[in-house]
């Protein structure tokens, strides 16, 4: 599995700001969007382009346009919504496919409860967004669903990943690509990433 930890100074700086214990909901939300945008830039760097002639201000002009499969952005509810706008800044016409999965607090197992996917998934590249890759359960369940619907090219964008989550994802889906802003030390006994960001969903939505 291709794993890319984006080491750009802006990414590292912004993730550092997100680790502050008393960060406001507004600031955390803004930074999640900004880092999501920067990860998208990296994840799409291998998209192919083709020459197209358009009508410019002074007559026909040849330009580069992205070719190939269409893109669908797949936020995992609810925290994934916090990164979605950052992705859409670069691809505003991308279709949105929503997947709802929550983690059982006792067993840590993923529980699917909702999905609404774009049409013709077999013709699309999926950019799956979720702030944290902890145990990997929710991400694996989401990718299972996407593949069941025919999607074969999948890129995962997360803010912070744990080694345990990376290992689980690679074992289940070695053909996907993972882009993250940080790979942290480990999971604690409650399944949270350490040092991590805390509960990203609560920080994005201002809930406890």
UniProtKB/Swiss-Prot annotation:
It catalyses: UMP + diphosphate = 5-phospho-alpha-D-ribose 1-diphosphate + uracil. This is Uracil phosphoribosyltransferase. Binds 1 Mg(2+) ion per subunit. The magnesium is bound as Mg-PRPP. 5-phospho-alpha-D-ribose 1-diphosphate binds at residues 78, 103, 130-138, 199. It comes from Vibrio vulnificus (strain YJ016). Keywords: Allosteric enzyme, Glycosyltransferase, GTP-binding, Magnesium, Nucleotide-binding, Transferase. The keyword Translocase does not apply. It comes from the Bacteria. Catalyzes the conversion of uracil and 5-phospho-alpha-D-ribose 1-diphosphate (PRPP) to UMP and diphosphate. One of its GO terms (molecular function) is GTP binding. GO terms for biological process: UMP salvage; uracil salvage. InterPro entries: PRibTrfase_dom (IPR000836), PRTase-like (IPR029057), Upp_B (IPR034332), UPRTase/APRTase (IPR050054), Ura_phspho_trans (IPR005765). The keyword Calcium does not apply. Uracil binds at residues 193, 198-200. Its cofactor is Mg(2+). Signal peptide: none annotated. HAMAP family: Upp_B. Its EC number is 2.4.2.9. Allosterically activated by GTP. Pathway: Pyrimidine metabolism; UMP biosynthesis via salvage pathway; UMP from uracil: step 1/1.
């Amino acid at each position: 599995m291709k794993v890319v930890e984006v080491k750009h100074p802006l990414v590292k700086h912004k993730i550092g700001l997100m680790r502050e214990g008393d960060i406001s909901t507004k600031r955390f939300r803004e930074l999640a969007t900004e880092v999501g945008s920067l990860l998208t830039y990296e994840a799409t760097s291998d998209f192919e382009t083709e020459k197209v002639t358009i009508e410019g201000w002074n007559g026909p002009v040849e330009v580069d346009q992205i070719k190939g499969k269409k893109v669908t952005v797949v936020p995992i509810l609810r925290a994934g919504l916090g990164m979605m706008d950052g992705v859409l800044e670069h691809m505003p016409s991308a279709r949105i496919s929503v997947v709802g999965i929550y983690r059982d607090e006792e067993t840590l197992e993923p529980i699917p409860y909702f999905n609404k996917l774009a049409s013709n998934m077999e013709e699309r590249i999926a950019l799956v967004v979720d702030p944290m890759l902890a145990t990997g359960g929710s991400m694996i369940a989401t990718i299972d669903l996407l593949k069941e619907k025919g999607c074969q090219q999948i890129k995962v964008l997360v803010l912070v990943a744990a080694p345990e989550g990376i290992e689980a994802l690679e074992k289940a889906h070695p053909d996907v690509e993972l882009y993250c802003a940080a790979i942290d030390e480990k999971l604690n006994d409650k399944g949270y990433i350490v040092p991590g960001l805390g509960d990203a969903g609560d920080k994005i939505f201002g809930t406890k």
